[in-house]
């Protein structure tokens, strides 16, 4: 088992003891430390934290622990569930929340997961802020809320669509030109949240022919999820067979993209 503590959050393999793996005890400790940091430092008046996740097998378990720890610290939580990393970052700003936690180990294999910590602007904590969270966790200097001050969980599944709509409004995006081009597009979403979002985005952009690989978001990644050349052979073959104009491959939380022509 592995647990890596850094200024950007914690990541590790699922299981093990609290110091050697990403498990419920380790998650509660670091979420409570993050919540304490937010209480001390936020300039936002709302008491909300946004939580989004990729489609890893461990995601539902990790999310439930995170929701419990945050509400136990007295925070309300906006649970946006399956969402890309950029979508979760935007949701923090749109909600005017005081922070956010993204549950993803990015391009790492399925046995990994992580907590990525955001400030009230939807940005990752800087080095000094991350170090403060680690210090609070090491000292366990956090106090949970009493029964009358527990937080609540609010489910909001609209942010993927809201993000797509915001893309369509960008000046650089010409939907009519894309539609008129009749592009044939191949995608590989590595069985994670890209499979929820990328086909919808392409359809909204006017792409009529989409050739899909691994779009079911069940978390059993069909191949190494890092979109680097040695992991692109399958979509390259699909593009040749389908005579696609372009191919897009994303990692599990859709913050890495490979474009194949």
Regions found by a protein language model. Give the residues of each.
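An N-terminal, well-structured beta->alpha segment
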Residues: 1-68, 72-73, 152-183
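Short, flexible coil/turn micro-motifs enriched in small/turn-prone residues
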Residues: 3-7, 47, 109, 117, ...
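Gly/Ser/Thr-enriched, mixed-charge loops and adjacent short helices
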Residues: 13, 113-242
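N-terminal small/polar loop signature for handling phosphorylated ligands or for N-terminal nucleophile
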Residues: 36, 48-112, 200-259
């Amino acid at each position: 088992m592995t647990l890596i503590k850094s200024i950007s959050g914690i990541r590790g393999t699922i299981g093990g003891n609290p110091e050697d793996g990403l498990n419920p005890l380790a998650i509660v400790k670091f979420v409570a430390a993050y919540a304490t940091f937010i209480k001390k430092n936020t300039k936002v008046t709302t008491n909300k934290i946004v939580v989004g996740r990729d489609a890893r097998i461990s995601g539902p378990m990790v999310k439930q622990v995170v929701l419990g720890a945050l509400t136990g610290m007295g925070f309300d939580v906006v649970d946006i569930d399956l969402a890309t990393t950029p979508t979760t970052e935007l949701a923090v700003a749109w909600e005017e929340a005081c922070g956010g936690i993204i549950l993803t180990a990015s391009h790492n294999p399925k046995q990994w997961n992580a907590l990525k910590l955001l400030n009230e602007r939807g940005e990752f904590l800087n080095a000094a802020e991350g170090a403060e969270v680690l210090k609070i966790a090491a000292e366990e200097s956090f106090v949970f809320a009493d029964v009358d001050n527990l937080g609540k969980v609010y489910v909001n599944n609209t942010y993927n669509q809201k993000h797509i709509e915001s893309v369509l409004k960008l000046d650089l995006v010409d939907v009519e030109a894309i539609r008129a081009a009749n592009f044939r597009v191949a995608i590989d979403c590595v069985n994670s949240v890209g499979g929820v979002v990328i086909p919808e985005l392409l359809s909204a952009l006017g792409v009529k022919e989409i050739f899909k690989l691994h779009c079911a978001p069940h978390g059993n990644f069909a191949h190494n999820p890092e979109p680097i050349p040695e992991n692109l052979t399958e979509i390259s073959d699909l593009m040749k067979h389908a005579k696609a104009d372009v191919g897009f491959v994303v990692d599990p939380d859709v913050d890495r993209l490979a474009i194949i022509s």
